[in-house]
Regions:
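Residues in well-ordered beta-strands of folded domains
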Residues: 8, 86, 143
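Flexible, glycine/threonine- and acidic-rich loop/arm segments that mediate assembly and lattice contacts
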Residues: 1-78, 91-93, 170-212
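Sequence/fold signature of self-assembling virion shell proteins
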Residues: 106-212
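Long, positively charged binding patches that form subdomain-scale interaction surfaces
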Residues: 55-136
């Protein structure tokens, strides 16, 4: 499914700050809003995982989250091709202290590779502190439509693909009737997990903390 959005920059804002500053500010805010649409849906599903439990330490919660999803796939007669883990950013730095880590970014998600037995670890404030979420890599599915598709251009709808995210297409044009600059965006990315019962939600502490 392709989703369509529009955001405008007023003539007054351009006159006050200049075209480049006014449009760049709106562009970044627009891009952030659209990225959040994708991530919010995905995180809502991750937080609904049914492999729930709790452990006394963050390190144990991390290990058990991995163990539970690998074990679940084995019970399903499937083989996990790897494991992705989601944690709160502050928990990572509390655990590591001053140690150097290499953090990469893709599609607006910050992540590390090959950390504590996980193939990929995503760091985000969307995950509560003291919670570790995990799922096999091959439990995740992505549907993607290229916003720069030449078929759109043939229809007179030419979009420039945002180089940072890779999944948002932008087009800007002036609208004289309203004296504004309209920014149009299309987005065709959906991330989801095929099996909710292959998502682990492990809390640190004396009890489970998942709320649905």
């Amino acid at each position: 499914k392709i989703e369509k959005y529009r955001k405008s920059v007023s003539l007054e804002a351009i006159a006050e700050r200049g075209y480049d500053a006014a449009v760049q500010s709106t562009d970044e805010e627009f891009k952030s809003d659209l990225t959040n649409v994708v991530s919010d849906r995905f995180y809502a599903q991750l937080k609904a995982g049914s492999l729930v439990g709790h452990e006394s330490t963050w390190q144990m919660a991390f290990a058990m989250a991995i163990g539970k999803v690998v074990n679940k796939f084995q019970e399903m007669k499937r083989t996990a091709t790897g494991v992705a883990v989601w944690v709160n950013t502050l928990d990572v730095y509390k655990y590591l202290g001053a140690a150097d880590i290499t953090v990469q970014t893709a599609f607006g998600f910050k992540y590390m590779k090959n950390f504590m037995g996980a193939d990929v670890v995503f760091m985000t404030s969307q995950i509560p502190e003291g919670v570790v979420i995990a799922t096999p890599l091959n439990n995740m599915v992505a549907y993607y439509v290229d916003p720069g598709d030449s078929e759109f251009a043939k229809a007179g709808l030419q979009y420039t693909t945002d180089p940072t995210t890779g999944f948002i297409g932008f087009h800007v044009q002036g609208t004289y009737e309203r004296a504004i600059s309209d920014m149009f965006a299309i987005m065709g990315l959906r991330l989801f997990c095929e099996y909710l019962d292959a998502i682990a939600y492990i809390s640190v502490g004396d009890s489970d903390t998942q709320t649905l």
